[in-house]
Swiss-Prot record:
The keyword Metal-binding applies. GO terms for biological process: purine nucleotide metabolic process. It comes from Tolumonas auensis (strain DSM 9187 / NBRC 110442 / TA 4). Catalyzes the irreversible NADPH-dependent deamination of GMP to IMP. It functions in the conversion of nucleobase, nucleoside and nucleotide derivatives of G to A nucleotides, and in maintaining the intracellular balance of A and G nucleotides. The active site is at C186 (thioimidate intermediate). Its EC number is 1.7.1.7. This is GMP reductase. It catalyses: IMP + NH4(+) + NADP(+) = GMP + NADPH + 2 H(+). GO terms for molecular function: GMP reductase activity; metal ion binding. SUPFAM superfamilies: Inosine monophosphate dehydrogenase (IMPDH) (SSF51412).
Length: 347
């Protein structure tokens, strides 16, 4: 047994230190980024935010809505091949450029992935997603995916430490997904005692990835636009959002009424709700590591995305970053014991 003494930080532990700026308006900030990926040597340009590959977030409807903002969606893995075929037939190539095809690591998952990617060459992104990215089996699976799809961009995770980021990049991942337990409907940290504060995970994993020419996506833990900006400031190339994009018109799931108000259900992908829906129940050797919540219906996602992008632009003006790419270079975090004045409660 050993203990690491240095303190690890989450988004709530810091604020940006403001700095002199030559920017006169938020409209001058460029949020688009262009990335060149290590293994494929191909490029992608867009706003580097990704809707999470969850049943009630990463939907086809969400992909259509977010693509208009040049924002990416990781489509959840539970759509059938027929549903994918219909979506591809009714979608333009530019829309498909903002979609990731998600997969698990079973043989059936791999065969399904092959058939989906064969539907269109515009499907360039693969998201290989497991809760625990530390197994040898996972790294071996990433190698197989890389060998099979040499021209596709692979995003793989989840991990939270530099050495495993390096392992996955060397195994064939272009982008590594970072985060264990920070999500709003994730209970892994409570159920298992395992995790890593998200901001420190991003800072450490970004350093490891960038040294090898890879990228990371900070997955989870964001509760407001300021957290998204902090993830970028900490070095995340992409930021993945679940709860912040849940309960919208495009989120999937059923709306229901209570006391004259409209709600939608949102649940973690390791929750009992998800396992009952997709695996027929919780296996005897498993425990639920997610929760199910009922959220007030928020309407179309466009207003939420505009609020997030506006917040990040404002962050950039406060620290003097004319481009999102510059934000991490302009970032100085200060440790704090408070984030906001709570006298009137949450907004």
């Amino acid at each position: 047994m050993r203990i690491e003494e240095d303190l690890k930080l989450g988004f709530k532990d810091v604020l940006f230190r403001p700095k002199r700026s030559t920017l006169s308006s938020r409209s001058q900030v460029e949020l688009h980024r262009e990335f060149r990926f290590r293994h494929t040597q191909t490029s992608w340009r867009g706003v580097p935010i990704i809707a999470a590959n969850m049943d009630t977030v990463g939907t086809f409807a969400m992909a259509k809505a977010l693509a208009s903002f040049d924002v990416m969606t990781a489509i959840h893995k539970h759509y059938t091949e027929q549903e994918w075929q219909t979506f591809v037939q009714n979608s333009s190539d530019p829309l498909l450029q903002y979609c990731m095809v998600s997969t698990g690591t079973s043989n059936n998952d791999f065969l399904k992935l092959q058939r989906i990617l064969a539907l269109s060459p515009a499907l360039r992104f693969i998201c290989v997603d497991v809760a625990n990215g530390y197994s040898e089996h996972f790294a071996d699976f990433v190698k197989i995916v890389r060998e099979t799809f040499p021209q596709h961009v692979i995003c793989a995770g989840n991990v939270v430490t530099g050495e495993m980021v390096e392992e996955l990049i060397l195994s064939g991942a272009d982008i590594v997904k970072v985060g264990i337990g920070p999500g709003s409907v994730c209970t892994t940290r409570v159920k298992t005692g395992v995790g890593y504060p998200q901001l420190s995970a991003i800072i450490e994993c970004a350093d490891a990835a960038h040294g090898l020419g890879g990228q990371i996506v900070g997955d989870g833990g964001c509760t407001c636009p300021g957290d998204v900006a902090k993830a970028f400031g900490g070095g995340a190339d992409f930021v993945m959002l679940g709860g912040m994009l849940a309960a919208h018109e495009e989120s999937g799931g059923n709306k229901f009424e209570r006391d004259g108000k409209t709600f939608m259900r949102f649940y973690g992908m390791s929750s009992s709700t998800a396992m009952e829906q997709h695996a027929g129940g919780i296996a005897h050797y498993r425990a639920s590591e997610g929760k199910t919540v009922e959220l007030p219906f928020r309407g179309p996602v466009s207003a939420t995305i505009q609020d997030i992008l506006g917040g990040v632009r404002s962050t950039c003006t406060y620290v003097g970053a004319a481009k999102l790419k510059e934000l991490t270079k302009r970032t100085t975090f200060i440790r704090v014991s408070e984030q906001e004045n709570p006298v009137y409660g949450q907004e």
